[in-house]
């Protein structure tokens, strides 16, 4: 790796090994270790895998207190002072060459303490942004409500009840100014985003002084691949189809966790009332209340923790439909493609970036008729596009190994 091996890396994230970002961090950890780097993961909640060298920042009690105070005063990121001071002491002892931040929200770090250190430490710093929280006064996403206050200064936040939820004071104005002061003026900082869309937003924010590298998220292609009914994996597909009485149906699949209107739940309700009964819509990841409120034209399934079951569902679907109204770079699109299934998505956030004209369609937001037209276009393509082979070819671009290597070559070895 061009003489860069042996350098010490500190990876920082809310969780280690769980959730999409936690799994990404662990995958990057192992890739860096294999490339000759020395690594340590610092995280704030839950447990770390046994094969990862890790440091827990604070305790469950620290997280609970931080969360409770944030709900009262809307000052997420400005508690956990002692836990963060202890963490910085450990960082000084470990003395990394590179500090790679991921999600630093999640009720476990004090921004004042952390960035006082980062501004003076002289280390190379990478910060991968997975949402928009870094440059807003409160929220992690703003596209759904069409808010642009983040471009000049937040105030009177319309999303106080969204993560990081607050039931008390609106501190979005002071949060914005504090973040702007803390997050700017850092030497040797490189930002990474998973999509061009998020890169563009960063370049319109107070973070515009920093270089931004786009490294799309990767997925595990040994877990997500086509399950055929005539081979061993296909038994699961066969059983699911029979159990849900889906024989001779055109299957349209949606997956989210959690489901909300901003993830397209209400859109699917409207779509189901537009399509004929030759179609079956399956939504995966619903809670009990949502399951009970579905109309009888939608089949609802709870969240599955089985990768095999999820891959089988993707594989048996004729089309994967993502009606999200805001997202940075949804991995469900990639998982569907990896299982050989074409994708239809709204033109929202970074969702369209994972597909091209060979494997999917992009539709203007809130256009149910546009979704119906895209469904018909894919089903009537006659093998000229949207084939399994074309979807798999596209998915190869997002193998986790390829993307982790891109991190090393395009970020670690260039800073």
Regions found by a protein language model. Give the residues of each.
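A charged, aromatic-enriched C-terminal amphipathic alpha-helix characteristic of glycosyltransferases
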Residues: 366, 383-413
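Conserved donor-binding/catalytic core segment of Leloir-type glycosyltransferases
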Residues: 192, 237, 243-263, 269-272
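Nucleotide-activated donor-binding/catalytic signature segment of Leloir-type glycosyltransferases, i.e.
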Residues: 285-308
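Short hydrophobic beta-strand element within catalytic cores of glycosyltransferases
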Residues: 342-345
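Membrane-proximal helix-turn-helix segments that form the acceptor-binding/catalytic region
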Residues: 120, 149-191, 200, 206
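Aromatic "clamp/platform" in nucleotide-sugar-dependent glycosyltransferases that forms part
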Residues: 325
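Conserved acidic donor-binding segment of nucleotide-sugar-dependent glycosyltransferases
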Residues: 357, 361-368, 377-383
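Short alpha-helical donor nucleotide-sugar binding micro-motif in glycosyltransferases
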Residues: 312-317
